[in-house]
Swiss-Prot record:
GO biological process, one term: negative regulation of extrinsic apoptotic signaling pathway in absence of ligand
Family according to the record: Belongs to the HAD-like hydrolase superfamily. EYA family.
Cofactor(s), names only, from the UniProt record: Mg(2+)
Keyword Hydrolase: yes
Organism lineage: Eukaryota, Metazoa, Chordata, Craniata, Vertebrata
Compartments reported by the entry: Cytoplasm; Nucleus
EC number: 3.1.3.48
CC cofactor note: Binds 1 Mg(2+) ion per subunit.
Protein name: Protein phosphatase EYA4
Organism: Takifugu rubripes (Japanese pufferfish)
Catalyzed reactions: O-phospho-L-tyrosyl-[protein] + H2O = L-tyrosyl-[protein] + phosphate
Length: 119
């Protein structure tokens, strides 16, 4: 019961801030985060901008969704998604952590949910 409440609260926070992580951080941390993001963009030849554009195109299609499978634990993975401003293209229901159950189980759940005719 306590765990279910925790995950409901996490989902609520994720949904609230998926398009505005700066609102979660506060002004001082927001400015530092924006500066860090700008530095990462400069050092990676705008990798994040290009990735976000590609993922946005996919999520805008009516018959497509983005799914994320990670070996990071779920809560830190959600935090990373928000910090990279990817919350808008990855609904929380489509983020799977393989930490405890393994990648195979994650992909079985995805196939069970979306079917076998996926790319």
């Amino acid at each position: 019961r306590k765990l279910a409440f925790r995950y409901r609260r996490v989902k609520e926070l994720y949904t609230t801030y998926k398009n505005n992580v700066g609102g979660l951080l506060g002004p001082a941390k927001r400015d530092a985060w924006l500066q860090l993001r700008a530095e990462v963009e400069a050092l990676t030849d705008s990798w994040l901008t290009h990735a976000l554009k590609s993922l946005s195109i996919i999520s805008s299609r009516s018959n497509c969704v983005n799914v994320l499978v990670t070996t990071t634990q779920l809560i830190p993975a959600l935090a990373k998604v928000l910090l990279y401003s990817l919350g808008a293209v990855f609904p929380i229901e489509n983020i799977y952590s393989a930490t405890k159950i393994g990648k195979e189980s994650c992909f079985e759940r995805i196939v069970s949910r979306f079917g076998t005719n996926i790319t």
